[in-house]
């Protein structure tokens, strides 16, 4: 079991559930824009927010943001150790640093002293793009062992100053290297791991890489907190992270829609129906629907359709221009093809209201 780390009022590690994080892409000094994005992220289900703090203007913005919000806020620090100290003074619930790029042991000692004094945890965040020169020289390129060595070396530096309120991340944009590096550190350290695939890319490719990289780690029981990194609106990261956790059975929340791939037996426009069910289910969740771990099955024919539909909370098995609705394993009624999506979502809503 991993060590417990408290970030504001949120626990990471130990027996705590896996938390979902994101990072604002607004300038931190633009307080109003950043607060608007934080509110959207919170509404989507984000549990920890990270903000960049590159200079004094950002520090002052960070201070005001902390005054306005309750969600745990992490300060992301690079190069200038003084910004880490200033961010802690401004109320940071955690700081993220790469000890190797803030200017030597004395600077790290100063940051650690302030963090210990204020009971603020530190994430040691190592990336494939910023490995130490001696490690790159030893391995010739970015490797899993090199990433793990860098992370553990920097953790040891914090421990040298009697600091152990630590979270570790070691991210690569290469899914296999990323996976192997986390496995190494997971076996060699009891600090909680912040998992993700860095620079995953645009949503189309980034979601594939994140599903493979993060999903593989989660299936092995590795990871205490996670961020899906996408070149997109950060809110999209949260939606995908929640969907990933639900798909793996780690969280039971929201509405999960499953549908068959179709074949020559399909006699309805199943793709259109499934997309409409997903759209309506999404709208229902956005409206504050309180359902937990609901599964909807949209099936195209009589081969697997009735069985799959009965296994789901709600489902439809389609025939020629129509569908047979199921709820909680029981047959409900037949409906016309054009009414399937509406009637299926109505079943969900009616059960909730009954």
Predicted feature locations:
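N-terminal amphipathic alpha-helix/helix-capping segment at the start of soluble metabolic enzymes
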Residues: 1-22, 116, 279
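Active-site mouth loops of central-metabolism enzymes
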Residues: 15-33, 52-54, 71-79, 135-148, ...
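Hydrophobic faces of well-ordered beta-strands that scaffold small-molecule active sites
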Residues: 18-24, 49-51, 73-77, 95-97, ...
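Glycine-rich, proline-tolerant flexible connector loops at the mouths of alpha/beta enzymes
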Residues: 25, 30-31, 42-65, 96-104, ...
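Glycine-rich phosphate-binding active-site loops on the catalytic face of alpha/beta enzymes
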Residues: 47, 91-105, 197, 220-234, ...
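Alpha-helix-loop-beta-strand connector modules within alpha/beta enzyme cores
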Residues: 55-77, 110-122, 182-193, 280-281
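Hydrophobic or amphipathic alpha-helical targeting/insertion segments
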Residues: 82-123
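Catalytic alpha/beta core domains of metabolic enzymes, predominantly
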Residues: 127-130, 135-281, 289
């Amino acid at each position: 079991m991993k060590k417990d780390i408290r970030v504001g009022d949120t626990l990471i590690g130990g027996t705590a559930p896996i938390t979902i994080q994101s990072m604002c892409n607004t300038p931190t000094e633009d307080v109003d824009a950043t607060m608007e994005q934080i509110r959207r992220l919170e509404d989507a289900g984000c549990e920890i927010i990270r903000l960049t703090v590159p200079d004094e203007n950002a520090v002052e913005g960070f201070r005001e943001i902390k005054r306005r919000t309750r969600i745990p806020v992490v300060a992301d620090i690079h190069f200038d150790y003084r910004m880490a100290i200033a961010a802690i003074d401004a109320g940071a619930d955690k700081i993220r640093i790469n000890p190797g790029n803030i200017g030597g042991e004395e600077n790290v000692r100063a940051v650690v002293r302030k963090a210990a004094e204020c009971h603020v945890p530190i994430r040691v965040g190592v990336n494939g793009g910023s490995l130490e020169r001696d490690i790159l020289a030893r391995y010739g390129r970015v490797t899993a062992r090199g990433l793990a060595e860098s992370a553990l070396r920097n953790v040891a530096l914090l421990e040298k100053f009697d600091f152990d309120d630590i979270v570790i991340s070691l991210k690569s944009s290469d899914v296999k290297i990323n996976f192997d590096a986390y496995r190494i550190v997971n076996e060699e350290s009891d600090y909680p791991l912040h998992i993700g695939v860095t620079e995953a890319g645009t949503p189309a490719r980034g979601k594939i890489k994140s599903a493979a990289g993060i999903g593989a780690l989660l299936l092995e029981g590795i990871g205490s907190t996670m961020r899906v990194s996408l070149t997109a609106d950060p809110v999209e990261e949260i939606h995908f992270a929640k969907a990933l956790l639900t798909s793996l059975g780690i969280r039971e929340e929201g509405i999960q829609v499953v549908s068959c791939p179709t074949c020559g037996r399909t006699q309805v426009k199943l793709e259109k129906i499934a997309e409409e069910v997903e759209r309506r289910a999404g709208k229902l969740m956005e409206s504050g629907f309180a359902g937990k771990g609901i599964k909807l099955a949209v099936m195209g024919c009589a081969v697997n359709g009735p069985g799959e539909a009965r296994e789901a909370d709600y489902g439809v098995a389609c025939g020629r221009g129509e569908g047979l609705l199921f709820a909680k394993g029981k047959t409900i009624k037949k409906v016309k093809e054009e009414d399937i999506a509406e009637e299926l979502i109505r079943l969900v809503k009616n059960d909730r209201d009954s």
